[in-house]
Structures are given as C-alpha cells and as structure tokens.
Amino acid sequence: RSFFYPLRFFFCEGPQCALPLVALNYHNVEIRIHWATAASNYNVECFANYYYLDNEERGQVASRKHDLLITQVQKNIASGTLVQELTFNHPVKYLASSDTTTDGALTSPTNKVKLNINGLDVSNYKWGKPHFIDVTSYYHTNFVTSPDFFLYCFCLSTSSLQPTGTLNFSRVSSATIMSESMNINDPIYAVNYNILRVEN
C-alpha cells in the first residue's frame, strides 16, 4: 500500500516558485521533517522535481540576484481564555484554525467571535459557523477539505501566489481575536508573505 502527500512549501506552488539551486551552489538546502512515533512503521521517501537549464541559462541564473516572494506559516499558542492575542509579523494574507470537535470556540455554531485591531473592532461579534467557515471558504478559497476550518481572510484569494490583500502585522500595535462565550483552546496560524533574497 502506498500514499502520496504533497509537501506544501512555497517553492512547491509552481515552476515560477522553484528554488534557484544553481545560485545556491555553495549552500545546502535541507528539508527536515519530524514524524510522530507511529511513522516508524512506514518506509518514507521524498521526491523532488527539477528544471534543467542549458549552460547559458545556468550562468545567467547563477550570476544574478533573485528576490523570491515566499509564504511562511506562523503559529500562536492557544490562550485558553476568551481573548487570544495575535503576535504575528509581516504582511499576513489569512488567519486559520481548525477543530474537528463541536466545542471549538472559533468553529462553533453556538459561539460568536470578532477581530480587534489596535483597539478597534473590525466588525461586531459573528457566529463562528457560518461566517468564518462557510462564507469565507466560499468567497476566498478554491476548496477547503475540512468542514471545521476557521478562516479570517485579508486577501481576495487564499490560493493566489501573488498578493491580493494583506494586513501588515509588523505595523499593528495590537491584534486580538475575541470569543463571546467559549475559551479559545486551539492554536491560530497565520500565512504571511516575505522576501527571500538569493545573491552571490
């Protein structure tokens, strides 16, 4: 029996996002994966796709500076209270959290949540489901496989490689998600943009 799990790093999103390994010829590129103990029962292999260049193209890629637009994932540990401080940096395209049980504060159909930026409410309290699950998935994603996936978007499209909107958390004094009646017990993730510069 065999399984296929695509790794969703920024350089896996398409040919235009590939790492210019020719320009990194004096550096190692490593992928470190920490598996749970149950993974020791499996034989795991990792495969990569390469784009081959002729000698002239290789010289051009190796000699010039590359500024790559990349995405990163940041994580906030759950506060266990009604207020969750968001201590993120960089331009964030969306916030996400997931809870497959019925008692997740952000994904519950019986709890309301709101976002507060610099002491100002972005909106009134809204039901976690449908406002931050069904509605945001419909308008801002191509597909979401989890039925209980909290999503707060600052972008028009979560799957677009180019920015379609962000909130720059580096310029924000304070940001919080507030729950009306249930403690926030799930971590919150932020997907942000950054620039990776490669130069010789």
Residue spans for each PLM region:
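Flexible assembly/topogenesis modules
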Residues: 1-200
